[in-house]
């Protein structure tokens, strides 16, 4: 058998793996300090996305809606945007960045949001908010094409394009994290800190894992500042961890400001983390210190303790954001596991030419890769006889795990039916250790439930 990359055989979608473009743009916007986005569309385009993110992070945050109703969908709804901007700026005096995120309905009716924002900058802002720093921009998200991944990538590009300003050269690098968890940001910043590398960490959500303090002070907002975004044009280079969640912005900085760019690999597992640290070292001239060599060794030791005996030859199905899903598949191969099914949940034609996917086709002969996939592609294959030992993916696939009694490790977005998953990294050496041990523990619990409560290590 050879690894095949195929597109979903059906036209319709049964239980999608991804949601639509505006969700990705909203997730990018919450990584910016003093930023509240306005989603130009129906209230559901905000409510359900905000619910997903809040369930995942276990934190509250602000996203506004222009609340387009039936009349606006027929006759146009630009007046709703104008009202929304004025109300938002009045109610939140500290807000400096207001992206207008379009949706399928407002893109179809052709609302000229760009033209309206020019009008607001000339009339509303000088009149109602004189002397106040306010930045308006449009993020076009026609949600009838692409997915939340497309929307995130577009938003990252549009924010960088809006603010990047050439000035004196900086000693920092740009790190575009992509769609990650607070625990991942913490791990990435730790790696950079140990290497004594300064960075503009873009669209970072570490503060969504924030403490409850005695004075009741509580913040859960993004930490990337306007100054960080402006300084991206002056950096030593850009590292975009994810090909589909930041490459457009990295390419823009490279073409416009001659900022060197490195795209990936997503640092899932030992091998990819090694590549990430090598890229940082080459870009900055900083050596990889002994502390990180030790952390790498600890991760390797933890993996050696469980890898061959408990993980080897285990059959896995994987779905998640594309860069994460591909990274997880590569890590599973490194652990001697057998990835059987990789589901990529949108119709990006670039997947077939992705060098990582090409490598998977060469190195994983038993793997089937399905693009534009949905959960029926997983469930139907199980019904047809696909035997799996483990599923890796977000919480939306939990019913397949339950119904077919296949143990599942929650990873990716959204994860809301297991406590604290957003707090633990899956990137870096710490993430490699956490992932391997979580997979092993999940298999242990499943074996105890199905086979022998007093299991013997050397017989399974």
UniProtKB/Swiss-Prot annotation:
Pfam families the UniProt entry points to: Oxidored_nitro (PF00148)
Single GO term (MF): iron-sulfur cluster binding
GO terms for biological process, alphabetical: nitrogen fixation
Aminoacyl-tRNA synthetase is among the record's keywords: no
Taxonomic superkingdom: Bacteria
Alphabetized Gene3D superfamilies for the sequence: Nitrogenase molybdenum iron protein domain, Nitrogenase Molybdenum-iron Protein, subunit B, domain 4
Cofactor remark: Binds 1 [8Fe-7S] cluster per heterodimer.
Cofactor(s) this protein requires: [8Fe-7S] cluster
Keywords per UniProt: ATP-binding, Iron, Iron-sulfur, Metal-binding, Nitrogen fixation, Nucleotide-binding, Oxidoreductase
Entry EC no(s): 1.18.6.1
Binding site for [8Fe-7S] cluster: 20, 45, 104, 143
Reaction catalyzed: N2 + 8 reduced [2Fe-2S]-[ferredoxin] + 16 ATP + 16 H2O = H2 + 8 oxidized [2Fe-2S]-[ferredoxin] + 2 NH4(+) + 16 ADP + 16 phosphate + 6 H(+)
Keyword hit for Magnesium: no
Function: This iron-iron protein is part of the nitrogenase complex that catalyzes the key enzymatic reactions in nitrogen fixation. Other nitrogenase complexes utilize a molybdenum-iron protein or a vanadium-iron protein.
Family indicated by similarity: Belongs to the NifD/NifK/NifE/NifN family.
Subunit structure comment from the entry: Hexamer of two alpha, two beta, and two delta chains.
Name of protein: Nitrogenase iron-iron protein beta chain
